[in-house]
Amino acid sequence: MQTKRENQPTFFDLAVQQRGSVNRVLETIAREVDFSEAETRVTATYRQGGRPACRAGVLLRVMILQHLYGLSDPQAEEQLQDRLSFQKFVQLDTHEAVPDETTICRFRQRLIACGLHEALLGLLNTQLEARGFIVKRVTLVDATLVESSRKRPDAQAAREGRAPDADASYTRKYNQSFYGYKAHVSSDGEHQLIRAAAISTASQYDGEVLAHIAPADSEVIYADKACDTKANQAWLRAHGIRNGILKKEAHHIRLTAADVAQNQKKSLVRRQIERIFAHLKKWQHYRRVRYLGLAKNQLELTLKAVAYNLKRLAGILEMRRA
């Protein structure tokens, strides 16, 4: 694939660098994180030759911007036209055209088709682990509900598969009906960095997902009562992981006073992960998914996890410098 990038910056490039608007978060991310391996993997999926295309590295960074600031494809195109800090972050040269919304959309489809979105969070976390930001001692696991991007169908249509979003489903929480998806996350207990993230239909039982998102290299895993199943207890024992899951009562087993006290202690640790969901929903606009289907919404969640970790890294480094 041919690209538009020139090796030598123009005079105007240098002028823009000197007067460009300051965005400390983006500058810290650009300085501290190496995107080269991710860029190489994406670029390798393109055919060699043909007409010039927007560079994969530019589009990858556009994806990150979108999920840092909750931007749609048209909004991303518009903001890139106007904000020098965004142009600088995506490494867009002054002679390069800003990618339009169609190009951004096609790049997203390419990531899904090639399965590369599954590697993006792992590539970032490898760097964070190497620098000691992800500590594998304590892992927190939890899930949150995210609304569907489509209007709720009636229950009969949903059961018969006639809903506009076939992968969304109904569930109940706090005695209220909810239609959409469920985002499952595991995080590092020390710095609250996301280690793994998976999307499921809203009716998916939390306990069935723990083994898929909880890293097996953890020393102890804290999770809600929904994960207190025999299968999860066996999985923890098989991997030599201490059980920090809150105990739940069964119809034939009552919790002792000691169990209740232990649950309270575990809950104090586990609830730290709720800050991640609060950030995703408030600052990264994740109260509602943007797309239809599990595949596209898994990509969205993965990119939001990448963006969250990048912003969290910038915050940690800023606190250390203070």
Language model features with spans:
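Secondary-structure capping and boundary motifs in well-ordered enzyme cores
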Residues: 18, 34, 50-57, 96-100, ...
